[in-house]
Amino acid sequence: MTTRPNKENRNSVRHGFPRDLIVFLTIAFVITAGIGMAAQVPQAGAERRVTHRPIESFTLVDQNGAHFDLEKLTGKVVVVAFAYTTCVDVCPLITAALRQTQIGLGKEERTRVQLLTITTDPEIDSPKVLKAYGKRYGAEFNNWAFLTGSSAVLGRVWKNFGVGIKHRGRGLVDHTPLTAIVDEKRLMRFVYVGPSPDPHAVLDDVHSLLKHQS
């Protein structure tokens, strides 16, 4: 991940590392997430999957240095993406897609939907670094938190969501390019695996869960 992708691989899911590692991370996700997935539909550079997986509660630290408890979001739809701030290829696409998702939410919907970006590189991604990263993408922090924490706690979170991680050196991390949608009961309902989830498709899934709440 030390160089930007060329024209031939800009839209691939290689994430700047060997194809065999992509296969490994994808298999790791499928095994971790369980066999109960169905309705796999390609979506603008990311594969959409339907699931029904419980997400364990966790407490991390947000971009302001405050403790952030997932349990407090019970009752809300939560869109979760995994990225790290020094990534130069896939993570910017994932974060930009999440920003477009935020823009697509109405005023009332923003009170019912929370966006989360969880780092895959806590060694570098301090709260201050994450806040600057969010600002760079125009994030509105009222319903979008950027989270870090200890490697031990984050390791459990990554595993729970099915995110494979391989640290290759300082500032270099290979990870499953994953965006997940969690419902109001903390069940992961939709997963997008790939570098560029379609914001319109993500919004459609969010709206379907909000409608189910009504």
Regions found by a protein language model. Give the residues of each.
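Sec/Tat-exported extracytoplasmic proteins
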Residues: V77, Y84, Q102-E109, Y137, ...
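Structural micro-motif
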Residues: N143-W144, G155, F161-R168, V173-A180
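Structural microenvironment flanking redox-active thiols in thiol-disulfide oxidoreductases
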Residues: T95-V157
